């Protein structure tokens, strides 16, 4: 049973955000900064964010050359340029909001490993298309420097992206949660939304935490639940995409700087703390990986380990230390969903595997909608 004090002071809010990942944190942060006296709460069903915000590889990336080429199968060049611009603006907003040191940002560039020689004509095409986004040409041919990398001779080309980098995902989320606490946002972890009911005067949220269920009331609600959004809005074009990440044991003598992609962006790796963090290969078994369930696909894991030993570090003795998975959200195209569902409810979702780049911007946009 609830007390008088709980009923009178702890259940009613001006603005509630569902989902405690990067988008949700920035939605709460943006709204509270714009309305300092508002009562703002953030609900996260896990003790830690459950989606991809703490499960990603920490890449501040905007699309490798072959990935952009693939994207043109599903959208126009103008749409692709616009989306790339949003990704870039998202990283700039993230860095400006929290500071590079607080999020562990490193401007180490991005690199695409090519099994064939670099397509210079393709590179020139995208440099010309994206020059207005970045202020200069983002891509350059670094194939002549391949000998300075530990990769196998199967790699015939190396394309650099001058504006990409990496972040420390743990520091990023930790910084956000601290900032939310400092400005007075109530954060409820381990709290799951079961259902909601909208009326003319409010939105009532039925939630559960542990064995306790109760109703919270809000004037406005932002759903920032990415791949899990169809639980509440099944009509939206959102499919889950599970991503597998492995991290090796420390590797003596490892010197590797940058964020790396291959196979049209599906595979990726980076060095951190003398380890290699690598993931992806979802394209090898998309039907199985179209799931909300966390777990490891043996086929994908075997291929990643093979790539690690034969393609990335063939001259090193490397052992996998541990692994995890995260759930991303995709659709018929890579355009994110930012939508006002009613006067009181808005949705920000479907980040297309680019949550680090898009998350802060989408959080701001969904807060501005309400």
Residue locations for each model-derived region?
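C-terminal catalytic lobe of FAD-dependent flavoproteins
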Residues: 314-370
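Extreme N-terminal leader/targeting segments of oxidoreductases
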Residues: 1-15, 33-34, 38
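A conserved short coil-to-beta-strand element within the FAD-binding core of flavoproteins
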Residues: 186-204
């Amino acid at each position: 049973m609830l007390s008088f004090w709980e009923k009178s002071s702890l259940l009613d809010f001006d603005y509630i955000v569902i989902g405690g990942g990067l988008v949700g944190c920035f939605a709460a942060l943006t709204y509270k900064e714009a309305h300092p006296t508002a009562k703002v709460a953030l609900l996260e069903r896990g003790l830690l964010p459950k989606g991809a915000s703490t499960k990603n590889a920490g890449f501040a990336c905007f699309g490798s050359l072959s990935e952009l080429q693939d994207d043109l199968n599903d959208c126009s060049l103008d749409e692709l340029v616009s989306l790339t611009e949003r990704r870039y603006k998202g990283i700039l907003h993230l860095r400006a909001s929290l500071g590079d040191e607080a999020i562990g940002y490193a401007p180490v560039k991005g690199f695409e490993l090519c099994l064939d020689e670099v397509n210079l004509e393709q590179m020139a095409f995208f440099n010309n298309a994206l020059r207005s986004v970045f202020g200069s040409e983002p891509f350059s041919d670094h194939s002549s420097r391949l000998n300075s990398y530990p990769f196998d001779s199967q790699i015939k080309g190396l394309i650099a992206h001058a504006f990409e980098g990496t972040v420390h995902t743990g520091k990023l989320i930790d910084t956000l949660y601290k900032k939310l606490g400092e400005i007075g946002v109530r954060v409820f972890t381990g709290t799951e939304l079961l259902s909601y009911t909208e009326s003319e005067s409010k939105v009532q949220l039925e939630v559960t935490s542990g064995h306790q269920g109760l109703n919270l009331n809000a004037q406005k609600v932002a759903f920032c639940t990415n791949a899990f959004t169809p639980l509440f809005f099944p009509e939206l074009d959102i499919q889950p995409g599970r991503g597998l990440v492995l991290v090796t044991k420390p590797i003596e003598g490892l010197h590797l700087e940058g964020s790396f992609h291959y196979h049209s962006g599906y595979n990726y790796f980076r060095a951190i703390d003398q380890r290699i963090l690598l993931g992806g290969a979802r394209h090898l078994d998309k039907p199985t990986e179209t799931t909300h369930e966390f777990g490891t696909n043996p086929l994908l894991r075997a291929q990643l380990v093979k790539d690690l030993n034969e393609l990335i570090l063939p001259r090193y003795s490397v052992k996998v230390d541990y692994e995890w998975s995260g759930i991303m959200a995709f659709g018929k195209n890579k355009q994110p969903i930012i939508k006002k569902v009613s006067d009181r409810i808005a949705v920000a979702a479907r980040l297309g595997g680019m949550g680090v780049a898009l998350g802060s911007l989408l959080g701001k946009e969904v807060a501005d909608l309400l």
